[in-house]
Amino acid sequence: SVFISYAVFYLTRKNFSAAMPAMLTQTSLTAEDFAIMSSIFYILYGAMKFVGGMLVDKINPKAMTGPVLIGVGIVNILFGFSDSVAAFYVLYSLNAILQGTSFPPMAKIMASWFSKNERGRWWAIVEAAHNIGGSLAPLLTSFAIAFSGSWKMGFYVPGAISLLMGIVALFTIKDRPGTLGLPNVGQWRNDPTELAQVKASPVNLSFWQIFVKYILTNPLVWIIIIGDMSVYIARTILNDWPQIYYSQVHGWSLIKANSIISWFEAGGLAGGLLAGYLSDFMFKSNRWMTGLIFALALCICIVLVPLVQDTSYTLTAILFTIMGFALYGPHMLFAVGCLDVTHKDAAGSITGFRGLFSYVGAAMAGVPVIMVKNSWAWSGVYIYALIAILLTTLSLALLSRLHRL
């Protein structure tokens, strides 16, 4: 239920960028509007992820997921009924506010039900849900628009799916083991690394004491945040802008341009899963060395982009698949790794705090991208993404070094 819910959240987020080429021709929206709306979305999303993380450490995770899915479904359907640019801004902002509270409950569930020595692979499986949702969104949206001839169907269909899944989630998602009369996961799994983290997490601290000592003044958290912001800049550029670039510059059809994003997400699905398993089994929960290997592969891939973009669709699709594979390794490992370096009871808070800065990074792939494009064309956008990837790699190298000390 957690897996499908997370996939549906992404389905109702990425349908907007998938529908954008059609909306640019069928409505009065401009590329500048898209950039501004994207930045607003990511800022609001990050802020609400922070708030949601704080809330979920105190309440039942199931009390958030189902109602939020229902709300997101309603907003998407209303978006399809709208025609004014002002309404688009308002509804997309409301979608961001609701979507921002989507992941912290899932992070809390993962931290509560899976121990440290297995968390990498299980987290990777849940993280794969957004690759599936992100992969299906451009295809489902493109076919819905192509079948109906209107961009509106690209919001009606995902909205209806979200409504249905929200009702299912109300009955299927469970709270933490302790509330169901079960032992904590470290005892049940007999995991010494999990028990050590529990032992190092005092139980009589206030929320503020935990936040200050284990998050705000934790240097490892800040290095993770810098790396995560950078990977979000790169991910958002590679996820939100190629369909516009290929449709406008190379004249690709909507389905063809959006299919590149599906290949990117399909590669990300495999990369995230493999990174989780490697970090658990081969690298003994060392998330950072695992992530560094993936980041180095991503550096190689991004350098190859200018060499294949004007050749063939097949080569472009292959490269985007490999880039997705390489990028989603660090993307997933930053998320699970931050749980390993903080208080056991702060899973929601650290996820929300990290998410606040992650989506500042995502917002930096909105308006700043259109500013870079207007000044230095698409080659400037490419260099911007390259710099973000290099910063991600440096952050992982530093974390890997500190892990060995």
Predicted features and spans:
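Cytoplasmic helix-loop-helix junction between adjacent transmembrane helices
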Residues: 91-132
